[in-house]
Amino acid sequence: MALLAIGGLSSCEAAPQLVYNGDTLAWNTDWKRTQCGTLDISKNIIEVSGIACSRVTPGYIWMQSDERSNYIIATDEKGAERACKVKFPKSIRWDWEDLSGGVYEDKNYLFIGAFGDNEETDGNYSVIYLEEPAIDPVNTPEITLTPGNIKFVYPDGKKHNCEALMYDNLTQTIFIITKVYYNVCQVFSMPFRLDYGDETQTLEYICDLGVRSDLGYSEKNQPYKGFHLVTGADISPDGKYILIKNHNNIVATYSWILYWERQDGESVADALKRQPQPLKCYSYEWQGEAICWLDNNTFYTTSDADDGNPPIYKYTRKWPEGINDPIVNDQMVNRLIMLGTTLFVRSAEGLYTLDGRKVE
């Protein structure tokens, strides 16, 4: 749940360079951001804290609210009209904080993180899941479903506030990231299964995101400025890329999107223990919490704002001059070349992988 930003720079300015694990990180400049839409909250949903691109009906984005609602909605990237509303029984825990999608046993699922606990006094945490329904705005604009529910506790026996969830298609694993003020956030995991029933699962601790000394110390009651207050995360559908964002609602522009590229055979846990790359194109969003991948070259963010209509931002990988995404640009077809079992794009500057990296 978002709180008021009371300090920092103006929202149009980018964050400073990030100190993480004791190092000042270099920016990743391979991405650009554009506003693709504006969410009409009168027709859709307010306080969007989680989003996930539909895999069953491409072109739509699922959204959930942390405003004690018992439903999720789908809209397109323009955000003007609601395409679908999925309602759940009111008995489902209400403090939802993030949304993710993934594949399990050849079916597409949506996962809702019902684990918000700002005061760290609740202890009633779960991940709600459902098989993703098809979106048909004309014939089924509203659906009622009964989802599954996986209850969990943390391995340290403590209560934690959490606002970020991501799912790894390669290992069918759910990852949960705590939201911590003035300290580092922690990553936990559990395997996804359909047969947990009422059994409460104990998460596995994975790692901390950075170290405590990264955050600095308050001066004249000013808050810490490093990477804490994580609000959203996602893993690309093929498992290759990881995004984790924070939203510093106290020092506004000390907010970043961190990016990891997994190596072949590398686990999510091992990837997260390496240094990330903060994305230079990102600048502070008012109450911006939600993030999701569309594909390896595109992702979205939007805001938890409950007043006004928040923007929907689209991030696309930069391509060398004359090259756009070869998957969606028909003019690129004659530039594709197969070497062994790998597809590349030819340009005057050389060969590039399909995610825009030059082959040296």
Task: Map each language-model feature to its residues.
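C-terminal outer-membrane/trafficking sorting elements
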Residues: 321-360
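Bacterial N-terminal signal peptides
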Residues: 1-8
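Sequence/structural signature of beta-propeller domains
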Residues: 15-320
